[in-house]
């Protein structure tokens, strides 16, 4: 069996899809379906069982057995960079992850987890080293602290433990994320409503490493298949502009004039204007597949979003 936490969420459901594509259906999805709309991410996927996240962690803490587990992909977390309830974030993202990590270490179960580029903060260098890490929000801090925890236990680990610092992920199955969904998702919705696509004023100076979710899932699967341990950036290695995203959306629809709107006050000083993954460490594992450009990935995503 394979366990995917956050399996009804954005990246988790794409990992389930990638596992299905390998012929694996013996998958336990762990999630919180209080937001019932997330069920839609699982409708076309094959899984063996579902468990609520609180029931699951209670079983983990109790030491319950789930049979033979080939791997755990831990994608479940509060991923809202705008959430400022630190007690909730640390419990949900940090303590939960530690419990699951130790369960896997004790049983030598390969453990792959979602970290984030939010661990870096305001830097021009995105390399997996302490000197470049300085999160700007409590979400980023929760991910940073778990990475630090993993770094300390890695030398003693007898089974793979692998964290991925996701950059700006976009693509299918993010519909439930609301305001935290990708720019491409929001621009598509604006055009469908007959509006012009809108970018924040000043965004011509913002550049992000936008990575397609299919590529993210592929790296997770490859690292599992190859027994990789460590903490790795997962982006494309190239920063592209928000304008490039908008251009790809407009080109797909064949209509729309890009407009600018004021930059929100509450995001100032808490917003990464530039991200670009240094992929040196990931490439050193032997992973050599190319990543989709914004033009390629957004076009594929638009086709998925607008399928009949």
UniProtKB/Swiss-Prot annotation:
EC top class, as a word: isomerase
EC number(s) per entry: 5.1.3.20
One Pfam family linked to the record: Epimerase
Annotated binding of substrate, by residue: 168, 179, 186, 200-203, 208, 271
Membrane-spanning ranges: none
UniProt similarity note: Belongs to the NAD(P)-dependent epimerase/dehydratase family. HldD subfamily.
Assembly mode: Homopentamer.
Function: Catalyzes the interconversion between ADP-D-glycero-beta-D-manno-heptose and ADP-L-glycero-beta-D-manno-heptose via an epimerization at carbon 6 of the heptose.
HAMAP family, per database record: Heptose_epimerase
Protein name: ADP-L-glycero-D-manno-heptose-6-epimerase
Gene: hldD
């Amino acid at each position: 069996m394979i366990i995917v936490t956050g399996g009804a969420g954005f990246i988790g459901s794409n990992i389930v899809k990638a596992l299905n594509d390998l012929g694996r259906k013996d998958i336990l999805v762990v999630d919180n379906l209080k937001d019932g709309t997330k069920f839609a991410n699982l409708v076309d996927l094959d899984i063996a069982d579902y468990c609520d996240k609180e029931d699951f962690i209670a079983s983990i803490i109790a030491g319950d057995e789930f049979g033979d587990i080939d791997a755990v992909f831990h994608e479940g977390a509060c991923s809202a960079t705008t959430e400022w309830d630190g007690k909730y974030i640390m419990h949900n993202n940090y303590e939960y992850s530690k419990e699951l990590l130790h369960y896997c270490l004790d049983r030598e179960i390969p453990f792959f987890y979602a970290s984030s580029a939010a661990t870096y903060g305001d830097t021009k260098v995105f390399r997996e080293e302490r000197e470049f890490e300085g999160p700007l929000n409590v979400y980023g801090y929760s991910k940073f602290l778990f990475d630090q925890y993993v770094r300390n236990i890695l030398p003693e680990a007898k089974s793979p433990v692998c964290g991925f610092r996701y950059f700006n992920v976009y693509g299918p199955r993010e519909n439930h994320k609301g305001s935290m969904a990708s720019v491409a998702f929001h621009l598509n919705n604006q055009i469908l409503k007959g509006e012009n696509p809108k970018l924040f004023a000043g965004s011509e100076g913002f550049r992000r490493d936008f990575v397609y979710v299919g590529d993210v899932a592929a790296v997770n699967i490859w690292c599992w298949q190859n027994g990789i341990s460590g903490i790795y950036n997962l982006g494309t290695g190239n920063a592209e502009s928000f304008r490039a995203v908008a251009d790809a959306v407009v080109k797909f629809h064949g209509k729309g004039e890009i407009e600018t709107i004021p930059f929100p006050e509450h995001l100032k000083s808490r917003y990464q204007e530039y991200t670009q993954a240094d992929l040196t460490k990931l490439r050193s594992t032997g992973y050599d597949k190319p990543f989709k450009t914004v033009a390629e990935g957004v076009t594929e995503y638009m086709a998925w979003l607008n399928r009949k």
